[in-house]
Amino acid sequence: MTPEEEAAILDAALTRDTLAHAMQVARFLESPAPAAAWRWIDTFLEAFAGECPTVREALPIVADLRAEAVIVPAIDLEKLRNRQVVFFLDAVSQYVDDQRELRGLPVSRDVLEIAKEFGLKSDEAHWCVRVALTGKSTGCPFELLFPLLGHDRIMMRIGAISSHLLHGRGLEPIPYGPGGVPFKTIEGTKPT
C-alpha cells in the first residue's frame, strides 16, 4: 500500500464501510467481516461518531478498545487502592461473566446497584469502573462501552487492576499526593 492510499483510507469520512475497511487494513478485523463485527462497528459508531469525523481519529480508539490491557495513571490507580473498591470491581466482573449478552443491558443502573452493596457513591462507582476498563475518567455510556469491550476484555482488565492493587504494596495507600496534599482513596460507607 502506498502512503497516498493509506492517507486516503485514514482521511475518509467515518462510516460503517470506511471503518470496516480501515480495521481490515490495520488487521483489527478479518475479511469478510462476520455479522458480529458489523454489530461491533455499529455500536462503535453510535458511541464515537460524534467525536471522530474521520477514520484517522477513530482507529486509535479502536486500538484502545481491542487492547487486552489498559494503562491507568498512577494517581488514579492509587484512588482505587481500597478493599471496598477491589471487591466492587470483582462484583462488576462477576456481573459481566453472568451475562450471556452485554448489548441492551441497563449497565449503568446495574453498576449503581452493585455499588450500593459496597457503600460507594454513584459518581465514584462509575469513575472506578471507567478507569479500570479504559484508564480514562470520561467516555461513552457503559451501555455502549461494555459491548465494545466484551466479556473477556472486561474481566481481564478488572483482573489486572485487582492483581496490581493486591500485590506489591497491597491495599496500603500513599500518604500524600501531588504537592504534598494528604491523599485519600475512594472509600465506601456502611450500606443502609
What are the language-model segments listed below?
Residues 2-118, 177, 184, 188:
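Small-residue-rich helix-loop
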Residues 104-173:
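Charged substrate- and nucleic-acid-binding regions of tRNA-handling and nucleotidyl-transfer enzymes
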